[in-house]
Amino acid sequence: MAATVAFSGVLRRAGWRLLQLRCLPVPRCRPALAPRAFRASAMQLRSLDQQKDQPPPSSSQQQSEAQGAEEPNPEALRSPPRYTDQGGEEEEDYESEEQLQHRILTAALEFVPTHGWTAEAIAEGAQSLGLSSAAASMFGDDGSELILHFVTQCNARLTHVLEEEQKLVQLGQAEKKKTDKFLRDAVETRLRMLIPYIQHWPRAFSILMLPHNIPPSLNLLTSMVDDMWHYAGDQSTDFNWYTRRAVLAGIYNTTELVMMQDSSPDFEDTWRFLENRISDAMNMGHTAKQVKSTGEALVQGLMGAAVTLKNLTGLNQRR
């Protein structure tokens, strides 16, 4: 009888153990590690395996390691520069080729008054950054990249100025200018950026008129006059939108030509010419005949300017 009771107790305990095992929660399937986490886990496992294969450290090694742990190296604690990409993942910071070229061209502008829009100016700019002068070989020999970079920077500076003026008006800290005065000041502000380089600007202008530079230079010009009209408050959606920008582009280019030949103090003749052209544009009607004549005059003026500048700079001479 006692044996039967004992055997029954064993069965009950075994059944309870089985029931406990069946009631244990089933672990959920863990998602696959992301590539970055997977690489980190693999590195940790590899490190553990290497530690297992190595002999145990001696007491002197343990003491030196303990001292090193007490006095961490500041350089080791400094994390490398990182940035966040479009996917939200952090990567180590690096400088792309475009960023390097941007830095070199920006530094080269300081040497344009001395060397002009040349490879020598680019080489000097590279050396000022601690780079080899051979970095100038990243660019062409005609200075096109340097000139286009300068125009792009000037347009960005102008946009910033116009944005700041708009903010002051919105905050009530400045009065809103009339359209003619706003455009005149905007064009003058942009042209004054050429003054430090005015001696070499005729050649830059002629280089921008070369066939392979016309698309980017025209894009920069149209973008600039569009910003001017935008901050002037233009909200036209009809044909006047194109007319106003074409007229302003013509005014800018013709005033630029006058400026390159102006010897008056502080380019007074240039600003007087600009004011008269802006006034004429504001008084001009919007008939089809006037629009056509304005467009034809603009094209003829630009073509004449290209021929004139080629003659001045000697680009039309055979070498």
UniProtKB/Swiss-Prot annotation:
Residues 46-99 are annotated as: Disordered. Keywords: Acetylation, Lipid-binding, Mitochondrion, Transit peptide, Ubiquinone biosynthesis, Ubl conjugation. GO terms for cellular component: mitochondrial inner membrane. The modification N6-acetyllysine is found at residue 176. It is found in: Mitochondrion. A motif (SIFI-degron) lies at residues 17-32. In response to mitochondrial stress, the precursor protein is ubiquitinated by the SIFI complex in the cytoplasm before mitochondrial import, leading to its degradation. Within the SIFI complex, UBR4 initiates ubiquitin chain that are further elongated or branched by KCMF1. InterPro entries: COQ9_C, COQ9_HTH, Ubiq_biosynth_COQ9. A 1,2-diacylglycero-3-phosphoethanolamine binds at residue 245. Residues 1-45 form a transit peptide. Residues 87-98 have a biased composition (Acidic residues). Pfam families: COQ9, COQ9_N. Homodimer. Heterodimer; two heterodimers of COQ7:COQ9 come together on the same side of the lipid pseudo-bilayer and form a curved tetramer with a hydrophobic surface suitable for membrane interaction. These two tetramers assemble into a soluble octamer with a pseudo-bilayer of lipids captured within. Interacts with COQ7; this interaction allows ubiquinone (CoQ) isoprene intermediates presentation to COQ7 and facilitates the COQ7-mediated hydroxylase step. Belongs to the COQ9 family. This is Ubiquinone biosynthesis protein COQ9, mitochondrial. It comes from Bos taurus. The gene is COQ9.
